[in-house]
UniProtKB/Swiss-Prot annotation:
It comes from Homo sapiens (Human). Pfam families: LRR_NXF1-5, NXF_NTF2, Tap-RNA_bind. This is Nuclear RNA export factor 3. SUPFAM superfamilies: NTF2-like (SSF54427), RNA-binding domain, RBD (SSF54928). Expressed at high level in testis and at low level in a small number of tissues. Changing L302R: Inactivates CRM1 binding. Keywords: Cytoplasm, mRNA transport, Nucleus, RNA-binding, Transport.
Amino acid sequence: MSLPSGHTTGHTDQVVQRRARCWDIYQRRFSSRSEPVNPGMHSSSHQQQDGDAAMHGAHMDSPVRYTPYTISPYNRKGSFRKQDQTHVNMEREQKPPERRMEGNMPDGTLGSWFKITVPFGIKYNEKWLLNLIQNECSVPFVPVEFHYENMHASFFVENASIAYALKNVSGKIWDEDNEKISIFVNPAGIPHFVHRELKSEKVEQIKLAMNQQCDVSQEALDIQRLPFYPDMVNRDTKMASNPRKCMAASLDVHEENIPTVMSAGEMDKWKGIEPGEKCADRSPVCTTFSDTSSNINSILELFPKLLCLDGQQSPRATLCGTEAHKRLPTCKGSFFGSEMLKNLVLQFLQQYYLIYDSGDRQGLLSAYHDEACFSLSIPFNPEDSAPSSFCKFFKDSRNIKILKDPYLRGELLKHTKLDIVDSLSALPKTQHDLSSFLVDMWYQTEWMLCFSVNGVFKEVEGQSQGSVLAFTRTFIATPGSSSSLCIVNDKLFVRDTSHQGTQSALFTLVPTAFSSSVPAFSQEQQKMLPS
């Protein structure tokens, strides 16, 4: 059944208008949630502003339709941010690892020094730790300023590739307790040691460049431009790439090489001050000190040949604020702990050295325990130019700082009282000055006394007769029979003495310091005294 042509046209117009209204509602509802993917389609959708139904119909009939799964504007912005971040990451990945290790210093310069930190590295020996790291590291490195700080071990390396290689070692090495050792790498400034370190060859190159660029007529030199002088750039001094190092080095060279050149602004500060004179309150090098004494000391330390200070003859510089006329504290003398111990020890020493100096030392057998030990030491090697008075002590010396042979150490340790007395009898005959004795009771219990004796003696026979030597003797003793002491350990250390006038003031066998607190000798003991 056919419809009239007019009816067909009207019906078609209604359908187009209905579709247009539906599209407007649909577009307003979802315009904020969807956008065409193609930018060209996106721009064409904004051209539907004239309300023409035919245009709306044409748009509806086009292949472009609403796609509910397209990316929203919010998410698309996020994707752009991710793309930007990905682009940055790709650029970063394109850099070699060594370049990524380089960090910016606080002053904005690109640093080539790195600080290597081993957490809790204080428990590791320096040599052991560095060898362990070097064995695992793919490149050799030279640690600079190895030190311990805050329980950690730290050192510096120069070169980003070395720092990157050390970073790769982290977690790949283990200590003796089978714990992983971590390594942290951070950019750092130039270590203090490097500022002071400069090879002689580079010093000569700096001197040459400074002499060529110095304006002698005006006594001027631009040190800031020194690293970029042709002589410095052409030679492999690495100064142009490290101006700080050049500045620090050139200042040191400047003082000794071109002393006439003064820093800018320093001329006015020194006006009116003649050579050899200074004023403490006008010194430009001491403005940081608040008190005058510190100011004066600092000037005298910098200028030790100064003749006149503040119009007066300059005093001598004092070290650490200590006045030159002050002396060290004097010795406090002997220490015994109690009066009873004092009498016991002094009486023992008098009896011991009375027999020791008598010429027949076999009487000392009763003073030693059956299993006692004895050792003798002197502070010289047989090859050293020691005084002749020590020659007889060399063969018995058991100085373990010098003697490394374990067999000889064991042989020279005298064991049992018979060996001890035989060794003592072989030593030169002596005469001890009891008035020079200083006794230190450094440990005591109910069953043991430990004390040291310091004093001097002289040899009374042989080629070294009359020579005076000093000694320190350490006794460990236990209570013996007849309220006396029994020696279980005896260590004798003999050394040279530089006391002036010692021989003339020594050798009263029964000094007043001892006789006042110790009973006098018996008649039998008096007979043993040499006439």
